[in-house]
Design a protein with these regions (language model features):
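Hydrophobic alpha-helical segments
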Residues: 1-177
Length: 177
């Protein structure tokens, strides 16, 4: 399925999402990001939406220019953040702060060795963390990105890609109801 076909699954009430979907996956629409960064962020975000149509569409769009390690890193970002975002959202929200002093005892080796450029992996992880709503992880990834030299515009572009793909998934889900 193409992006145009994906957009056709959205109702007229999702016109803004259709327009945003047309622009956010371009270098002009995602300032300070390179094409492979946009593709990785979009693919990690697609996996985070859990929508098979979006996953297939984005994978089809990016597979011509993302490397196998970049595709694998998008999968890794989505899966490791699925675990971390739940765990650290609990740590952040629970009123008993003694939990934050306990070791997580969760394996997270992929974060230290993602198989691609660390900054690109952090962009993917930030996007997934935004979709999953973990404030503690959002802060941590934003700090890592800033430390690594990512601009605020690049960080915002990553979040915008995540937001639009998440809205696309919801729009498709409720479109025919």
């Amino acid at each position: 399925m193409s992006i145009e076909q994906l957009k056709s699954k959205l109702s007229e009430g999702a016109k803004d999402i259709k327009l945003n979907l047309s622009t956010i996956l371009t270098e002009e629409g995602a300032p300070d990001l390179m094409k492979n960064q946009i593709g990785g962020i979009a693919l990690a975000s697609a996996y985070a939406t859990r929508n098979p149509g979006i996953i297939d569409t984005i994978l089809s769009e990016v597979s011509s220019y993302l490397t196998k390690p970049e595709i694998n890193a998008a999968k890794s970002a989505a899966t490791i953040m699925a675990m971390n975002n739940i765990y650290y959202r609990f740590i952040h929200l629970v009123s008993d702060k003694s939990f934050s002093t306990m070791p997580a005892k969760l394996r997270m080796n992929v974060i230290g060795n993602p198989g691609i450029d660390k900054l690109n992996f952090e962009l993917n992880c930030l996007a997934v963390s935004v979709i999953n709503g973990c404030g503690m992880c959002i802060d941590a990834h934003t700090q890592e990105l800033t430390k690594a030299g990512a601009s605020k515009l690049a960080i915002q572009s990553s979040v915008r890609i995540a937001a639009v793909l998440n809205a696309t998934a919801i729009g498709i889900e409720i479109g025919g109801q």
